[in-house]
Amino acid sequence: MLIHTKAIIISALKYGEADLIVKAYTLSDGLCTYMLKGVLKSRKGKFKASMFQSLTQLEIVANHRGGGKMEYLKEAKVTGNYQSLHTHPIKLAMVMFLAEMLRNAIREEESNEPLFHYLEYSFQFLDSTDKIANFHLLFLLNLTRYLGFQPEMGIKDLPVFNLLDGIFQDFSSNDYCIEGKNVDLLKSFLGTDFDALQYIKMNQTSRNDFLSMLLLYYELHIEGFRKPKSLSVLNEIFG
C-alpha cells in the first residue's frame, strides 16, 4: 500500500557498503523499518544520508506491506528544519541518548497519533530552547503516558513512590519503593511543561540519581528494556 505520512527517524544502521537500514516512527503505522539502497554512495540520488540523522522529521511516501517486513521509501523530504539539534554538541549528545531510549522502548507497529505528536513537538522544542539540562528527564517521564505506565497522579502528597505499581503511597511495600529527594523531584516534574523546566533546580548528583530512577522505572515496565549505551556520555556532559 502506498502511504503518505510523517516520520521521525529513530536510527540508521549501515548495511553492506552503501545501504542503510532506517527505523522511523511514523504517524500512519507506528514503528517501521526501511531499506535504503545505495544511499551512502550515490551523490545524485533523491536521498541523502544526512536526511536520516536521529530524530530528523520527514514527510515520506513509502510502500508499506506491514507484518514486520522491511519497507521501501519512494520519496522523503525534511520538514521543520532543525536549527541546532544536530550541530549543538550538548544537544547532539542528548539526541543520541533519546533516540537510543526510543529504540529500546517503542515496540508499536501500529498508529499512535498522540505519541507521534508528542515526539514531534518535543524535538521541535528541544531544537528551539537553550534551557536543556533537565529536558531529557521530563521527556522520559512524559513518554510513560504514551507507553502505558505513567505514574498515578491522583494522590501526590504521600511520601513514598512505588516504582513497580506506579503509585504514591504512605509506606514502603516492596524493594522498588523510593522516598526522599527523588520523590520530591518526581512531584515537581509531574504536570510541568517544558518551558517551565528552568524553575526545577538540580545539581549533578540529583540529576544523575533521578535519571537512574527513571531508567529503573522503564526496566520494570518494559520487558527486555536495555539501558542506553550513550548514558555515560550524557552523564559526563551534564556532570
UniProtKB/Swiss-Prot annotation:
HAMAP family: RecO
Family that this chain belongs to: Belongs to the RecO family.
NCBIfam families xref list: reco
Origin species: Christiangramia forsetii (strain DSM 17595 / CGMCC 1.15422 / KT0803)
GO biological process, one term: double-strand break repair
Domain of life: Bacteria
Keywords for the protein's UniProt record, in alphabetical order: DNA damage, DNA recombination, DNA repair
One cellular component term from this protein's GO annotations in UniProt: bacterial nucleoid
The protein's name: DNA repair protein RecO
InterPro entries listed in its UniProt record: ARFGAP/RecO (IPR037278), DNA_rep/recomb_RecO_N (IPR022572), NA-bd_OB-fold (IPR012340), RecO (IPR003717), RecO_C (IPR042242)
Function according to Swiss-Prot or TrEMBL: Involved in DNA repair and RecF pathway recombination.
Primary gene name: recO
One protein family per Pfam: RecO_C
